[in-house]
């Protein structure tokens, strides 16, 4: 049989290794020969040795695939033309792009948390001129955003960022998202009208529980003990920092169990909604052959189905806000006039339109950032980023903000709760060190 180039390569490397072994008593355990700018996806060549023998082997290691592991956000690793692997050492390993990926998620989470703080603060400021028209502001954020999202989607399509394949993805998941969001809104509004603010804050922490549960069921994701404990501490920290000393327990006794269960059901629907969006992104990667679905495709189609469902529920929702359905058109007209601060009949709208417009812009930026964080990491990470914004916003309300008048005081357990929250975040992000043997890079599980 004719000698192939592979045979010559093995023979040459064996001879070279023999000379290296004679020079050093403790040879390196592994050497990676990486072909940069590989052609036709040829796998890199890895040279391995065993601790117990002097035999060296050459084997081809296929490029690492994207896979769902136990870490949120670690499963989707960007492919790059140049891959740098660990060389030598006792089983040390590195995944190309992992550090960059982690930094991207950290920056996105911090941005989402900051926008979440701004969203909460500006919402309270926007309600100062619109204190008589909160239902108008809620419907503006539902109906008005559809036009904005589809306008952005149109321009992105014309620019070639959004493709026809992206627009042709199945619409049933978006319908499910719209139904979940509208039902969550209706259930939440009905329960919130009978619960106190601190009670709602306590019950809202079940949102994270539902997300973890749905991620395990529908995404097959596994969480480490430190991640579960970290999420628990984050939720407990928010409860301590915001609701401590506010009579939340007494409020639960006064309102009964029915409204509390309805609020928990509302957060169940919201948890299912965010996990469903994560499913949409993961499924679209398969349908688009690795391409990433544009954010505004999800925002636009999800919003239009939500608007349809909200329109069907308007008689019920307006009644919850104490507005007879036959008076809804005049209420919307007056709310719009107050939003723009026009008309002599409308009074008490000082601060409009600046404050409401600032809230609308901040709210859109927050929603987009939240969806992007779901896309690049997971629904649970996005929930943690949103949860962190709660105590920070509470602290901001103690500052001398314009239009708010006398600043509020910090809750009694704010500092202790914030410390618990930070410890929970650090515990969730902590990755336990694992002892590995001779492997250069771990093989991804079969998909």
UniProtKB/Swiss-Prot annotation:
Q: InterPro entries given for it?
A: CRT-like
Where's it mainly located? plastid
Q: Superkingdom of this entry's organism?
A: Eukaryota
- GO cellular component: a single term: chloroplast membrane
Keywords (A to Z) from UniProt: Chloroplast, Membrane, Plastid, Transit peptide, Transmembrane, Transmembrane helix, Transport
Task: Tell where it localizes.
Answer: Plastid, Chloroplast membrane
The residue ranges crossing the membrane are 103-123, 135-155, 172-192, 200-220, 228-248, 256-276, 304-324, 351-371, 387-407, 413-433
Q: Which Pfam families match?
A: CRT-like
Topological relation to the membrane, as annotated: Multi-pass membrane protein
Transit peptide region: 1-48
Effect of disrupting the coding gene: No visible phenotype, but resistance to L-buthionine-SR-sulfoximine (BSO), an inhibitor of GSH1. Clt1, clt3 and clt3 triple mutants are more sensitive to Cd(2+), have a decreased level of cytosolic GSH, an altered systemic acquired resistance response and are more sensitive to Phytophthora infection. Clt1, clt3 and clt3 triple mutants have decreased lateral root densities.
Functionally, this protein is described as follows: Involved in thiol transport from the plastid to the cytosol. Transports probably both glutathione (GSH) and its precursor, gamma-glutamylcysteine (gamma-EC). Exhibits some functional redundancy with CLT3 in maintaining the root GSH pool.
Q: Which family does it belong to?
A: Belongs to the CRT-like transporter family.
Q: What is this protein called?
A: Protein CLT1, chloroplastic
């Amino acid at each position: 049989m004719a000698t192939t180039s592979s045979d010559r390569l093995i023979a040459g490397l064996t001879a070279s290794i023999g000379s290296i072994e004679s020079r050093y008593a403790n040879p390196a355990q592994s050497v990676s020969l990486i072909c940069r700018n590989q052609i036709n996806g040829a796998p890199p060549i890895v040279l391995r040795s065993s601790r117990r023998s002097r035999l060296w082997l050459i084997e081809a290691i296929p490029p690492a695939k994207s896979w769902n592991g136990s870490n949120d956000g670690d499963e989707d690793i960007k492919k790059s033309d140049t891959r740098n692997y660990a060389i030598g050492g006792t089983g040390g390993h590195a995944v190309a792009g992992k550090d960059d990926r982690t930094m991207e998620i950290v920056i996105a989470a911090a941005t989402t948390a900051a926008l979440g703080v701004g969203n909460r603060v500006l919402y309270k400021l926007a309600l100062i001129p619109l204190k008589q028209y909160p239902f108008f502001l809620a419907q503006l954020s539902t109906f008005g955003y559809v036009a904005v999202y589809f306008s952005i989607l149109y321009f992105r399509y014309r620019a070639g960022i959004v493709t026809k394949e992206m627009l042709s993805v199945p619409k049933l998941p978006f319908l499910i998202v719209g139904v979940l969001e509208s039902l969550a809104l209706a259930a939440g509004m009905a329960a919130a009208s009978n619960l106190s603010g601190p009670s709602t804050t306590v019950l809202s922490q079940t949102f994270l529980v539902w997300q973890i549960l749905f991620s395990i069921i529908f995404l097959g994701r596994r969480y480490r003990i430190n991640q579960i404990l970290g999420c628990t501490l984050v939720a407990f920290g928010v409860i301590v920092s915001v609701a401590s000393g506010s009579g939340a327990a007494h409020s639960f006794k006064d309102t009964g169990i029915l409204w509390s269960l309805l609020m928990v059901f509302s957060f169940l629907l919201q948890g299912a909604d965010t996990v469903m969006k994560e499913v949409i992104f993961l499924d679209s990667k398969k349908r688009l052959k690795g391409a990433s679905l544009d954010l505004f495709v999800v925002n636009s189609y999800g919003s239009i189905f939500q608007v349809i469902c909200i329109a069907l529920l308007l008689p019920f929702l307006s009644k919850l806000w104490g507005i007879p359905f036959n008076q809804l058109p005049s209420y919307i007209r007056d709310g719009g006039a107050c939003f723009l601060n026009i008309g002599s009949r409308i009074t008490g709208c000082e601060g409009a339109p600046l404050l409401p417009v600032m809230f609308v812009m901040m709210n859109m930026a927050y929603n987009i950032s939240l969806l992007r964080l779901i896309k690049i990491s997971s629904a649970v990470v996005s929930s943690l980023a949103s949860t962190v914004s709660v105590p920070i916003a509470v602290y901001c309300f103690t500052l001398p903000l314009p239009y708010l008048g006398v600043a509020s005081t910090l809750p009694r357990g704010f500092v202790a709760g914030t410390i618990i929250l930070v410890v929970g975040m650090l515990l969730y992000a902590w990755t336990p060190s694992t002892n590995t043997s001779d492997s250069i890079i771990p093989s991804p599980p079969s998909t």
